[in-house]
A protein has these predicted regions:
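Intrinsically disordered, low-complexity regions enriched in serine, threonine, proline
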Residues: 1-2, 28
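Beta-strand-enriched cores of mature, soluble protein domains
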Residues: 27-177
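Bacterial N-terminal signal peptides that target proteins for export
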Residues: 2-12
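Bacterial N-terminal signal peptides
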Residues: 10-22
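Serine/threonine-rich, low-complexity intrinsically disordered segments
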Residues: 5, 23-26
Length: 177
């Protein structure tokens, strides 16, 4: 009788410990969502190099660096505010319409970073501005963000020739151990 009781108590303790560990793991991997907008005054094309392809009028290949800052109301990732976003990319547009491959470094206030790789589709709206839709995969991070994974979705408006870019972001992420 005593051995059954000891076994049952031991089994309950092991089961409780297993549940606590799995609950901790699921909390660590719980998906988080962050949504925010970046107005044009907080975005700047730092460098752009445009090459006319020459096969079709208006066909341009462009390499660029786009920096976005958060002077106020910064979003937080893992409870730390984002300080800056540094995007590098290459577009292949005909009259402002076409694909764009890009990489972004998200720099947090504590110096940690996470990275994404994405694809953007731009469409010329006819007013010199481009309507953009992007999807990016989070590829990793540093420090406490080492196991970060997730998706970055963006919609926006841009006019690279006028150094204008504004966007709305939705980041869904989790941190794996």
């Amino acid at each position: 009788m005593k051995t059954r009781r000891a076994f049952a108590l031991g089994a309950i303790a092991v089961l409780g410990l297993a549940l606590a560990i799995s609950a901790t793991d699921s909390l660590a991997q719980q998906k988080q969502r962050v949504s925010f907008s970046i107005p044009a005054e907080n975005s700047k094309y730092v460098q752009q190099h445009v090459i006319e392809v020459g096969d079709t009028p208006g066909h341009e290949v462009r390499v660029y660096e786009l920096r976005r800052s958060f002077p106020g109301n910064a979003p937080a990732i893992n409870a730390v505010k984002v300080k800056e976003m540094i995007g590098s990319g290459m577009s292949d547009y005909v009259d402002g319409t076409g694909p764009n491959s890009n990489y972004t470094v998200f720099v947090l206030e504590n110096g940690e970073k996470f990275f994404s790789r994405g694809t953007t589709l731009a469409q010329n709206t006819g007013s010199g501005k481009l309507s953009t839709v992007s999807v990016a995969r989070i590829t990793g991070g540093t420090g406490k963000l080492l196991g970060i994974q997730g998706t970055v979705r963006t919609t926006g408006t841009a006019n690279p020739k006028a150094n204008f870019s504004e966007a709305q972001y939705e980041i869904e992420y989790w941190i794996e151990k």
